[in-house]
Amino acid sequence: MFGVSMRTLISPSLAPFSLHLHKPSLFSTALRFSFSINNITPTNSPPSTISTRKLQTKATRVTSSSSSQPLSSSSPGEIHVVVGPMFSGKTTTLLRRILAERETGKRIAIIKSNKDTRYCTESIVTHDGEKYPCWSLPDLSSFKERFGFDDYENRLDVIGIDEAQFFGDLYEFCREAADKEGKTVIVAGLDGDFMRRRFGSVLDLIPIADTVTKLTSRCEVCGKRALFTMRKTEEKETELIGGAEVYMPVCRSHYVCGQNVLETARAVLDSSNNHSVVASSL
């Protein structure tokens, strides 16, 4: 894992948890939040397998403040990075921060990778069912054109990026937005994959970030602090979209033990498959 001597956005140790709750997302150490936001319910409701509680928002994909004056880009912006394993509350934290910025009168937009199709394509959705409209894009370089160059330059203050590990142009986009265009960029994504290797270019943002927050979850086995994501299935590709049916948050001890169990099970399965192939060829 990496260490950073930077102030964090939230304190993971304050999050509630209960070992008796079934959903891994409720083990998250991210702070829960509640906003009183009125009048529009975003479309594309999450499926019934998640909570039906939704954020009521005034925004569609972009929220404008009462002022429509062009922005001044004379001063640099900021970059804030939120990382952690699955079910640690990264999207929840991103959404809380973005809505807090909106409450101060900032104009906001949220982007997520179009690879994330778990709940709905036109909104970011937390594991608890809270949602907010967003731009679902294959890359970040197309955002300015889709959003509108003039609107991007003059009527946008804060950009949220969810599932950031899937964007290959993440570093370049964030650096330019903050350094040259005066935007505040809040990024949420996985720092490591199921093999505990770096995932995408999220970690590349640390040297240019104003703050970095490392969230943790709760181990699905023992309830201790979970830093890692374990894959339950046999697939070995890095990018495999899934939720609790595919992944679980685990502590270091159960990651190591679990990996040994999974590797043994896979070896037995491979051996059984090989014997079946040999027998069928006789």
From Swiss-Prot:
Its EC number is 2.7.1.21. It comes from the Eukaryota. Its main location: cytoplasm. It catalyses: thymidine + ATP = dTMP + ADP + H(+). ATP binds at residues 84-91, 116-118, 162-165. Substrate binds at residues 194, 238-242, 247. Residues 45-76 are annotated as: Disordered. It is found in: Cytoplasm. One of its GO terms (biological process) is seedling development. Pathway: Purine metabolism; Pyrimidine metabolism. GO terms for molecular function: ATP binding; identical protein binding; metal ion binding; thymidine kinase activity. InterPro entries: P-loop_NTPase (IPR027417), Thymidine_kinase (IPR001267), Thymidine_kinase_CS (IPR020633). Residues 64-76 have a biased composition (Low complexity). Dimer. Belongs to the thymidine kinase family. Part of the salvage pathway for purine and pyrimidine deoxyribonucleotide synthesis. Phosphorylates preferentially purines over pyrimidines. This is Thymidine kinase b. It comes from Arabidopsis thaliana (Mouse-ear cress). The lineage of its organism: Eukaryota, Viridiplantae, Streptophyta, Embryophyta, Tracheophyta.
